Amino acid sequence: MFLIVGLGNPGNEYENTRHNIGFKVIDNIAKEYNIEINRQKFKGMYGEGFINGKKVMLLKPTTYMNLSGESVREVVDFYNLNNDEILVIYDDISLEVGKLRIREKGSAGGHNGIKSIIAHLNSEIFSRIKVGVGQPNGDLVKHVLGKFTKEETAILSESIEASTKAAAEIIKNDVKTAMNQFNGFKASTTV
């Protein structure tokens, strides 16, 4: 089984914030592959289904961002998963809105959700799709917990769709293939 985790914060007040783009991508994957995210366990909401004939679990941790690793660890332990069966999708402030970056491993880069996952897995080796949410002009917390502008929202729909395709490519083939295909991605709509 392959675990696909989208990072975000639970609660309506965070629903359309930059920090919750991982949840948005998971919702899009669920819609695309008819997977219902309607079960609660592992400190998260999840659903199981198939992508390209391979069994997957879509997980949205409900622990708040900084504790996401607790949820991921519970799934990994329960299903005895290896790190190469984990894909994490999350926001990246170092990328402009409309860009993606796929990686096989790496540091947290200041992202507290990834920091938590690395700590709970005791490893930086797991694949990830980073979705650009733009650089903050001032306060970082206000930026990541802020909502997207109308223009950015139009661009984001392309990023979400590309992230969905990239996740499917990782499941079907591998991370390197997805990197070659999507690391140069830039939404055609611009701000």
From Swiss-Prot:
It is found in: Cytoplasm. Keywords: Cytoplasm, Hydrolase, RNA-binding, tRNA-binding. The active site is at H19 (proton acceptor). TRNA binds at Y14, Y64, N66, N112. One of its GO terms (molecular function) is tRNA binding. The record marks N9 as: Discriminates between blocked and unblocked aminoacyl-tRNA. GO terms for cellular component: cytoplasm. Its EC number is 3.1.1.29. It catalyses: an N-acyl-L-alpha-aminoacyl-tRNA + H2O = an N-acyl-L-amino acid + a tRNA + H(+). GO terms for biological process: protein quality control for misfolded or incompletely synthesized proteins; rescue of stalled ribosome. PROSITE patterns: PEPT_TRNA_HYDROL_1, PEPT_TRNA_HYDROL_2. Pfam families: Pept_tRNA_hydro. The record marks D91 as: Stabilizes the basic form of H active site to accept a proton. Its main location: cytoplasm. Gene3D superfamilies: Peptidyl-tRNA hydrolase (3.40.50.1470). It comes from the Bacteria. Monomer. Belongs to the PTH family. This is Peptidyl-tRNA hydrolase. The lineage of its organism: Bacteria, Bacillati, Bacillota, Clostridia, Eubacteriales.
